């Protein structure tokens, strides 16, 4: 059996797996040092009491012969799809256009696989590594990286003369923590509609947006229905990162170049490849959607971001993002070699972060801080950061 050649196109190891290995090695070499891990974007706040109550009752039903259920509907519980249409989209998206999944990461891969190999995929640079990896595994002909730099407020620069099949866009963005404005989204939507491209819009962090003028969904712009697919997740909004649940939206208006509706193929794809998300988790999400987002947890993470921003600025770092996202994109002084960023924060501050270059070439010169930690860890990190200026640490 020959190896799938697409694997040879990937980096040797996944970014966050490499970070975990480095942290583990440092802890083994320095057992007396307390490491604060602000590298991985995982949640730390518990599930809401009402969500937990529904979850528990639903699981208990599986232990009773009279209430036991096996497989659920592949496309998701109709009650949950209706609730999302009502609460999250205010009717702009119908329940029939919403599909419940086991998380955003799998949705990205499934949707790119739906369109088949040989496509040209554009991703933001810097960007979540999964977009590039899944595009390559799905057999993309070409992956184009769209530079997102501070000079353009991290808005992607679209290359001229390139025929792009699919744009992978994330807003609020991971890793920069910045948000696309309505005007910026309209520009991208106009481009996609005029060039026959599809926008794969990752809105997994939309619950963090507090400014009503900033779009939480690409479908707040009506013209997106003919060019966009949206992905979202309960991981950050309700703390479901450990139980896995998300959703995607494929509008009925979205069509192939031959006029056939994409939604029909998507249903066929899911019926073949997916048996549906966990029923107890979906039922818990129905309760959670009524609370959406879990404002107490979101407020906690926003407070963390505010504390980190203040501490980093006091230590003379330039900080971007973090106001409408759980990530802060931190520019590191140019006098420090790029490859030393991770080691610098680990050895000087005993804080683990994510080096920006792991998100792409345009991430060089930056690091990402996650505000999804516990408050005691955030406060301890802030104390370490503000002891001295970053420039004093480099002496």
From Swiss-Prot:
Classification via SUPFAM superfamilies: PLP-dependent transferases
Return the broad EC class: transferase
Which keywords does the record carry? Answer: Aminotransferase, Pyridoxal phosphate, Transferase
Which Gene Ontology MF annotations are present? L,L-diaminopimelate aminotransferase activity; pyridoxal phosphate binding
For this protein, the record's InterPro entries field holds: Aminotransferase_I/II_large (IPR004839), DapL/ALD1 (IPR019942), PyrdxlP-dep_Trfase (IPR015424), PyrdxlP-dep_Trfase_major (IPR015421), PyrdxlP-dep_Trfase_small (IPR015422)
The annotated pathway is:
Amino-acid biosynthesis; L-lysine biosynthesis via DAP pathway; LL-2,6-diaminopimelate from (S)-tetrahydrodipicolinate (aminotransferase route): step 1/1
Spell out the subunit comment: Homodimer.
**Protein purpose:** Involved in the synthesis of meso-diaminopimelate (m-DAP or DL-DAP), required for both lysine and peptidoglycan biosynthesis. Catalyzes the direct conversion of tetrahydrodipicolinate to LL-diaminopimelate.
Family from the record: Belongs to the class-I pyridoxal-phosphate-dependent aminotransferase family. LL-diaminopimelate aminotransferase subfamily.
Protein name as it appears in the record: LL-diaminopimelate aminotransferase
Species source reads: Chlamydia caviae (strain ATCC VR-813 / DSM 19441 / 03DC25 / GPIC)
